[in-house]
């Protein structure tokens, strides 16, 4: 009897889920066994470690990161803000004064041009 490709594929499809289900069943049996096996002890230790990591170490890490972030970023920015805030109002005043000086210079230039024009016309 010759096997065709489609027959082989069908056999694999039919047989593989059964093996997968069997492996899952055996793994559950080992892990959930009422008898303390090495696998169940290891699983229990992993679960305990995961709980410790999430409840203790992760909180400490987040707190450490927050403190580090505050010291490296937030505190220097607050310091610069407090240091240079008084100058911000001063720079606005300088800008207004520069605009007034520029306007006065244009008025003086126009006045000078009008005086020169009147002199030349006489």
Curated annotation (Swiss-Prot):
Keywords: Endosome, Phosphoprotein, Transport. The keyword RNA-binding does not apply. The modification Phosphoserine is found at residue 33. GO terms for cellular component: BLOC-1 complex; endosome. The keyword Transport applies. GO terms for biological process: endosome organization; regulation of protein localization. It is found in: Endosome. Component of the biogenesis of lysosome-related organelles complex-1 (BLOC-1), a complex involved in endosomal cargo sorting. Belongs to the BLOC1S1 family. Component of the biogenesis of lysosome-related organelles complex-1 (BLOC-1) composed of at least BLI1, BLS1, CNL1, KXD1, SNN1 and VAB2. Present with 468 molecules/cell in log phase SD medium. This is Biogenesis of lysosome-related organelles complex 1 subunit BLS1. The gene is BLS1.
């Amino acid at each position: 009897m010759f096997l065709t490709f489609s027959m082989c594929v069908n056999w694999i499809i039919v047989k593989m889920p059964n093996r997968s289900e069997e492996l899952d069943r055996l793994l559950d049996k080992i892990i959930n066994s009422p008898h303390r096996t090495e696998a169940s002890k290891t699983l229990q230790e992993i679960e305990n470690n995961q709980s410790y990591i999430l409840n203790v170490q992760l909180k400490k890490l987040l707190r450490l990161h927050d403190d580090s972030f505050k010291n490296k970023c937030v505190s220097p920015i607050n310091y610069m803000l407090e240091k240079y805030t008084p100058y911000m109002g001063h720079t606005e005043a300088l800008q207004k004064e520069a605009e007034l000086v520029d306007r006065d210079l244009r008025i003086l230039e126009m006045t000078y041009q009008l005086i020169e024009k009147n002199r030349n016309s006489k």
